[in-house]
């Protein structure tokens, strides 16, 4: 299992580097450190802005999707499209999501990335996402991920958990 996770991480890191090179060529934005990782990607807000504007390819999305707890129905709902549209997009060669959808993909990837770090265990993080939280108005964190403000609340709660603040 650890070998599979390591392979996923290596694939994602490579995909991020390829994607960032494309973003640099298209937008003119230049990175000093070309050896960027998936984790580093979310720390560079200016890079994220340029990446969102370029859009996410379906191939890159597929790699991100493997790292998240969300199924096709969840993703379709988050992206504001039908599951059938998501499947059709998968079949299209060189499909690129619109910037608004790309932003949502990166937001959810960021939450998942932090959640997996905080909980050290994907199953614990996924369980937390689906349990009502007093700190989040007795809503499930998963329910709040549908919009940006909710996502910020979930990230805030994850940071608090990471710091040992359980209020």
Give the location of each predicted region.
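Non-transmembrane "mature" sequence context
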Residues: 1-167
